[in-house]
């Protein structure tokens, strides 16, 4: 979608909220590659608990995405967004103070409870006209995906200067700036019908019935789960491989080129999304992801890890952008927040399950973890086996 198709007001809003959510995502993801290794320095740590510390963020994100989505449908997006971001800030401060693995798990859980991504997607979708939504959501999804991916490279550079503990403080400052930017610069025009309206259980039940009765919507939820399961599993493994090849401080040598190439790939893909090839691109992306993971079997080769990371990152960023875009395309306006809450919940359940499974199997079956991720990626192809985009 060319930016010239947006009005000045729409473009300013879109850029502001995309950058704000992108910075929030970057700050939250920056420490992710170091959680599995940092956990070893904490009291009572085990590989399984390290996996839980990495993945619990995704679990609480999953639990709270739907309530936050429903809440935003009733009282508006801005207040819910600000409330959720403040939860993240408190969680980061607790992580900074954590001396044992259990307190870190608690902190990560609290960070995840600020489940605002669905709210952000709903706000963007409701702020532009119908014909502009695919382009707007592609821009939002790409910025968030790129921010999350590039944070892995940025994180390794920052870690050369700061300890993981102090990185939590840096992330706190970044996210507080996001909170201020949303508070001061973004205004929401809420329909009067939603101001102060109580949450009606019948309306919520009807919304769930319509959404979950749509086969494509259900498959998109499964696609989101699979994509995030693989992503979180891969980012449990790669830092441990690279710790022996480049050291954690050298991870940028892998992630920086991977992110740059993935961004170029995503820019090319957007034009095909606008032409209606979203589902076919999902299939191709899962195939590329599976091939990329296959390169990780040669875990001692810098170049194999690099090629695998590039292919994986291309697949991940494309899927992260397309899946919510298609979901918003088929969801009705009146329960868009609920729809985004559901699909983001499935994504974050995947973010929780991926590292927990990887952590539980890691000490004895490293190759089995890779095989599981490849099989799951190939199963992801089945989620796009339909040509119908019936609205729900």
Q: What are the language-model segments listed below?
A:
Residues 279-323:
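C-terminal transmembrane helical hairpin of 12-TM major facilitator-type secondary transporters
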